[in-house]
Amino acid sequence: MLRILGRRVVSASKELTSIQQWRIRPGTDSRPDPFRTFRGLQKGFCVGILPDGVDRNSEAFSSNSIAMEGILSELRSHIKKVLAGGGEEAVKRNRSRNKLLPRERIDRLLDPGSSFLELSQLAGHELYEEPLPSGGIITGIGPIHGRICMFMANDPTVKGGTYYPITIKKHLRAQEIAARCRLPCIYLVDSGGAYLPKQAEVFPDKENFGRVFYNESVMSSDGIPQIAIVLGSCTAGGAYIPAMADESVMVKGNGTIFLAGPPLVKAATGEEVSAEDLGGATVHCTVSGVSDYFAQDELHGLAIGRNIVKNLHMAAKQGMEGTFGSKNLVYKEPLYDINELRSIAPVDHKQQFDVRSIIARIVDGSEFDEFKKQYGTTLVTGFARIYGQTVGIIGNNGILFNESALKGAHFIELCSQRKIPLVFLQNITGFMVGSRAEANGIAKAGAKMVMAVSCAKVPKITIITGASFGAGNYAMCGRAYSPDFMFIWPNARIGIMGGAQAAGVLTQIERATKKRQGIKWTEEEEEAFKKKTVDAYEREANPYYSTARLWDDGVIDPCDTRKVLGLCLSAALNRPLEDTRFGVFRM
């Protein structure tokens, strides 16, 4: 479960902090009500307000509730493990050196009572033979003096904070978000550098360790502040993170920066020197000039970090003012219980549900102005507000037909022209197939929607609420289409197709191959082949398989969806919005 933290780090078993920490003042919407006349005409008829849409007495509601509780229990268990970092002994060693844990460091940088949205909390889950909690690095967004920042904090309790391939991928993803949203970067450095046994996977390629420093340089040149606080070891290539930062802080005693540590220096030159004398805070703050601020201890260093952000002079921000909601912004809570999202979301992806029941529980006042409601009905499109910010919502209500794809492309064009952020609620098994669909140009219609999604320059946020299969993933702004943020519910599945469908296709191919080769294929062998295929697809479609590899930005409790969307919108709207130019639409 993606955690939204308050002033103190909370455990996975605790509830989220209250909505008051959001700095968005609740109240009655003071905007003119265009539906007031209609509401007076017919009792009980409210234009723009979604109905409840949920039968609480249905078997589906009950079974979904039970199934989701089991799924969330598994999620909480996984999160509890990663919150423990590298284990009790590693944490004790860290404490003995008067060092805070990475989430505690972030907590002390954040504004009091504010929220922190941690990204990719389960990165590296079961990816390697040895555990690598959170991929060895904590990343996320939160405010310092009202300015939303991107935090990247090495976890020294996990393999000494060294970089595995997934650590680098997670670090680069955080930088990608920061660059796009123009968020100041806060590097909390405590790392032994690259994990040497996997040097071939972390060092030489374009998206490897060197890309971290490249991104740091490019963001600095683009006016995006790069701030490093050295709280522990900063060795070899890792030394370039603070050296290339706009401003850097070093903590006395624990913070060190050197290209080669004492053992390597002795081996290479014969010189015997301590880590502090070789590259400690005194050396780099008074002699070399590598660092700019000398901190007596961690708390002092983190306080200096807050002051650096306070003194940033950046251009005026857009939209929600970068404070997770303007203090003067007025919004309405949804009319319906957001906790019911746990009972709406099906575990069986063959079970249909109306995406409007999700929309009604995540948008302000459950108000939704639907666009083209009677046309292309398997795709729901319309305008709403989330914490006062206008958004365009695109949600699946079945497979995509020609009409629904054209409707989606039209709506994306509208939002792009008006610079309205897009929220995709993805539950899609694909496009319609068959001779009639092909003759009607399903590929052409789908291409229009994919073109629109690809070219749209407005902020795009994707939530996978159920299935995410095949080309439907593409049209609904999957990972390849660079959404600003993308999260996944724990009941979701993502893959090129469902396991049963894949087994059917591959079985036909295998049967034909064996027939050509003159090999007899028994019924038992065929069933075993099918089972093996289904099992493989189910394993690889699992949300934990996805999130471990950073195919998304985190697995979230459905009940957190509204809060996560609000935080993501706050971050995404820090950047100036560009005009959109579309490619050639095949008519």
UniProtKB/Swiss-Prot annotation:
Transit peptide: 1-26
Cell compartments where the protein resides: Mitochondrion matrix
Acyl-CoA binding as annotated region, ranges: 367-396
Main EC class the enzyme belongs to: ligase
Keywords assigned: ATP-binding, Ligase, Mitochondrion, Nucleotide-binding, Transit peptide
Boundaries of every CoA carboxyltransferase N-terminal domain copy: 68-324
Disulfide bonds: none
Pathway: Amino-acid degradation; L-leucine degradation; (S)-3-hydroxy-3-methylglutaryl-CoA from 3-isovaleryl-CoA: step 2/3
Biological process annotations from GO: L-leucine catabolic process
Region (Carboxyltransferase), start-end ranges: 68-579
Enzyme Commission number(s) from the entry: 6.4.1.4
One GO CC term, this protein: plasma membrane
Catalytic activity: 3-methylbut-2-enoyl-CoA + hydrogencarbonate + ATP = 3-methyl-(2E)-glutaconyl-CoA + ADP + phosphate + H(+)
Domain CoA carboxyltransferase C-terminal: 333-579
Tissues where the protein occurs: In roots, cotyledons, leaves, flowers, ovaries, siliques and embryos.
Gene Ontology MF: a single term: zinc ion binding
Reported function: Carboxyltransferase subunit of the 3-methylcrotonyl-CoA carboxylase, an enzyme that catalyzes the conversion of 3-methylcrotonyl-CoA to 3-methylglutaconyl-CoA, a critical step for leucine and isovaleric acid catabolism.
Description of how the protein assembles with itself and partners: Probably a heterodimer composed of biotin-containing alpha subunits and beta subunits.
Family: Belongs to the AccD/PCCB family.
Note, other: Temporal and spatial accumulation of the alpha and beta subunits during development at approximately equal molar ratios.
Protein name, as recorded: Methylcrotonoyl-CoA carboxylase beta chain, mitochondrial
Organism: Arabidopsis thaliana
